[in-house]
């Protein structure tokens, strides 16, 4: 415990005292495997460790690799990486027989035109110790290119982000003049009229790098983009630098394009872990049209913060897990006030811009739940109570005989009620819903065909 600035700061660590954990052997193994891949040496050892199968090199991308990829893919293919920042292994789990370790590091590579490109790499290893050797049980590697506007990134059909996850967060203004996007936890804007790229926010520094540049326990959430390039955004999780360095919380910022300044509007300190904070803000974060109010889901409550008076109120309390959904903009928030995803007869929808709440109900012998949002339209499902079986927790079944798509004004956009089929799961991808369906044979449900909306 340390007292700083009139407050107590608590530090903790977990010390494991045990014999025969083979810690040195595990660390040597993962560092050795990483070194062989980067330097393309001892390829026979890499080959002996991996497990190619029918999925080998299926994606043909360096953005994601695993134990089932080829030796060529795992040793970076045509890329000739150089170590830019060395890894430090972290032990996540360990016992006498197995261990899970992760590593984060940065590599550099030259393009054919002589440009230097930097990549952040995250690796996760699952290994097993035997007296004769160490076995690689699982390996996953993700690679994300660090955006550099000085390289040839502007193309006729858009911005080339290089090797990275396909799921990139971006928001445009209403006239599509300015686009804000997040790449490797850095926020950028792109002005279409003149092709200007501007870095708005990011903890990493170009010079005097240290571990704070690589500690990835926060996320950036774009809230709104104005037509002149102004951006409202939130940062959730652990604060690597700045006034709140070392704290967990949610910071709301306003970027004014005309002056190229970033102002902190408010910081909400939290005792939640960085992982939970990121999850909460992913679930709901909204800034009002006039920029005076910020709404966010934190620790099971929906808060509205007045950014002028620095006061807050709780709009919704005790929001249960798996009992809520928010629209793409965050303006609409749907939740089950009864707090039971398998036994609720009412669904509320709150318009965070106007403060108005709508209630959607089902019959007494039916149950309702929010499924997803398609942009600003709510998708909810209704099941017959007699068909529901949630006695096995996550393995239960909630067979919805009807799905309804409803806009923010409360108008029904579409109803989906297939004859003889029930929807049990919904997966959203862009503007399409993939429906997992079952059919009923007597009192038993059997696997059915997939459908789409």
Identify the meaning behind each predicted range:
Residues 2-4, 8-79, 153-196, 203-207, ...:
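Core segments of small alpha/beta cavity-forming domains
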Residues 70-115, 219-227:
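Surface-exposed, charged secondary-structure patches
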Residues 93-107, 229-235, 378-383, 433-437:
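A short hydrophobic beta-strand element
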Residues 98-136, 140, 145-146:
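Exposed beta-sheet edge and beta->alpha loop/turn motif
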Residues 118-124, 299, 344, 366:
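Short, surface-exposed coil-to-beta transition loops
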Residues 139, 197-206, 262-270, 313-318, ...:
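Beta-propeller fold detector
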Residues 190, 195, 246-260, 347-354, ...:
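Beta-propeller blade signature
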Residues 342-349, 357-359, 363-432, 440, ...:
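Extended, charge-rich low-complexity regions and/or helical-solenoid scaffolds
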């Amino acid at each position: 415990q340390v007292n700083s600035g009139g407050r107590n700061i608590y530090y903790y660590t977990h010390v494991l005292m045990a014999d025969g954990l083979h810690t040195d052997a595990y660390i040597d193994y993962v560092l050795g495997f990483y070194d062989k891949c980067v330097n393309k040496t001892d390829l026979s050892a890499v080959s002996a460790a991996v497990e190619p199968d029918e999925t080998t090199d299926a994606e043909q991308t360096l953005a994601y690799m695993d134990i089932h990829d080829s030796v060529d893919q795992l040793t970076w293919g045509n890329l000739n990486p150089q170590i830019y920042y060395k890894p430090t292994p972290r032990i996540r789990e360990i016992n006498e027989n197995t261990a899970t370790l992760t590593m984060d590091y940065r590599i550099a590579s030259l393009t054919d035109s002589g440009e230097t490109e930097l990549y952040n790499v995250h690796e996760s290893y699952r290994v097993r110790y035997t007296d004769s050797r160490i076995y690689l049980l699982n390996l996953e590697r993700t690679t994300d290119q660090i955006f550099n506007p000085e390289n040839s990134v502007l193309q006729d059909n858009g911005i080339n982000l290089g090797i990275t996850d396909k799921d990139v967060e971006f928001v445009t203004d209403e006239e599509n003049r300015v686009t804000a996007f997040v790449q490797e936890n850095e926020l950028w804007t792109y002005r279409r009229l003149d092709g200007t790229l501007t870095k708005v926010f990011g903890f990493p520094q170009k010079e005097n790098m240290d571990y704070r540049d690589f500690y990835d326990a926060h996320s950036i959430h774009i809230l709104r983009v104005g037509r002149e390039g102004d951006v409202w955004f939130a940062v959730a999780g652990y604060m690597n630098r700045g006034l709140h360095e070392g704290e967990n919380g949610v910071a709301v910022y306003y970027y004014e394009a005309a002056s190229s300044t970033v102002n902190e509007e408010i910081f909400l300190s939290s005792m939640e872990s960085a992982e939970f904070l990121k999850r909460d803000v992913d679930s709901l974060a909204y800034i009002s049209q006039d920029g005076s109010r910020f709404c966010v889901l934190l620790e099971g409550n929906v808060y509205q913060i007045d950014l002028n008076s620095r006061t807050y109120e709780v709009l919704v309390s005790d929001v249960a897990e798996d009992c809520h959904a928010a629209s793409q903009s965050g303006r609409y928030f749907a939740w089950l006030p009864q707090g039971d995803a398998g036994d609720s007869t009412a669904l509320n929808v709150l318009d965070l811009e106007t403060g108005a709440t709508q209630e959607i109900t089902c019959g007494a012998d039916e149950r309702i739940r929010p499924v997803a949002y398609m942009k600003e339209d709510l998708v909810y499902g209704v099941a017959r109570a007699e068909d529901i079986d949630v006695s096995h927790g996550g393995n239960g079944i909630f067979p919805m005989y009807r799905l309804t798509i409803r806009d923010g004004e409360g108008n029904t956009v579409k109803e989906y009620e297939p004859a003889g089929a029930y929807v049990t799961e919904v997966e959203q991808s862009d503007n399409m819903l993939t429906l997992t369906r079952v059919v009923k044979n007597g009192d038993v449900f059997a696997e059915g065909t997939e459908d789409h909306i």
